[in-house]
């Protein structure tokens, strides 16, 4: 973990709310700490959120959000090999419906819809959650990724836009919300706004690979290939080491090499990274 993130990971935790004040059904304090650790891993792509969540629910099998989050995180991997584990996590959460709050019940519905291929309905369910709990970082992250997978540029921008007023720098994970907003603006061709917000996110959290990714898109779309290459290389130690999203950002660097007709460098990245 990044030290400043982990130091604040247990900020304002209680048995009933997470670090952003979002309600959670009663659980062990250690379970909520595991949830926060996994959420940081999920947002930052540093570490394995599913590994953390598996250990958390093993220690507390009745932790509803642990099962819901584990299913949701695996769903975002979009790999068939995880389907049995996803189904098990969803069924575990469903079996605890008697102790689930309304938010958790809706998140279970979203996970079930997503598993069964109803991606649009899953996004509607996440939106229902966000209408009541705009600081639900897991819900906004899942919905944003699903907008990404579905190519829904308008919701990449507007879904974050509907909740951003409830976030500010003192709220844990704010930089990642800005990074999502920046990418949404870029996908809607609002490049200046995207660049401004991505840079703001990186001022708060320099290791945010998604914000670097948003900037790479801006520079690719504006033909700023040399600047884009310099961006990726100068920030390599922020976004590349031990980051699960690094392979995609390496691909963006390869694109900048290709734009310069530096094909050997692009091929070398393909072979080595």
What are these regions (language model features)?
Residues 30, 62-66, 102, 136-137, ...:
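Residue-level recognition of tetratricopeptide repeat
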Residues 14-33, 93-104, 169, 173:
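TPR-adjacent "capping" and linker segments in tetratricopeptide-repeat scaffold/adaptor proteins
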Residues 52-54, 83-96, 120-130, 154-167, ...:
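Alpha-helical repeat scaffolds
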Residues 28, 35, 68, 107, ...:
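TPR/TPR-like alpha-solenoid signature
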């Amino acid at each position: 973990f990044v030290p400043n993130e982990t130091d604040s990971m247990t900020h304002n935790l209680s048995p009933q709310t997470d670090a952003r004040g979002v309600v959670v059904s009663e659980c062990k304090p250690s379970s909520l700490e595991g949830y926060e650790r996994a959420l940081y891993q999920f947002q930052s792509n540093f570490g394995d959120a599913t590994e953390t969540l598996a250990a958390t629910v093993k220690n507390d099998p009745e932790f509803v959000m642990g099962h819901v989050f584990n299913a949701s995180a695996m769903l975002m991997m979009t790999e068939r090999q995880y389907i049995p584990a996803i189904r098990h996590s969803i069924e575990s959460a469903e079996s605890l419906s008697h102790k689930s709050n309304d938010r958790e019940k809706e998140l279970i519905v979203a996970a079930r819809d997503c598993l069964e291929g109803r991606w649009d309905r899953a996004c509607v369910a996440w939106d229902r959650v966000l209408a009541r709990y705009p600081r639900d970082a897991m819900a906004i992250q899942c919905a944003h990724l699903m907008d990404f997978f579905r190519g829904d540029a308008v919701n990449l921008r507007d879904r974050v836009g509907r909740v951003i007023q409830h976030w500010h720098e003192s709220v844990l994970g704010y930089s990642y919300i800005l990074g999502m907003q920046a990418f949404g603006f870029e996908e809607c061709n609002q490049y200046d706004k995207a660049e401004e917000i991505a840079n703001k996110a990186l001022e708060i959290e320099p290791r945010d690979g998604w914000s670097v990714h948003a900037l790479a898109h801006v520079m690719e779309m504006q033909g700023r290939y040399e600047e884009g290459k310099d961006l990726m290389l100068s920030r390599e130690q922020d976004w590349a080491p031990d980051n699960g999203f690094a392979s995609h950002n390496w691909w963006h660097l390869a694109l900048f090499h290709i734009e310069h007709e530096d094909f050997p460098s692009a091929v070398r990245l393909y072979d080595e990274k």
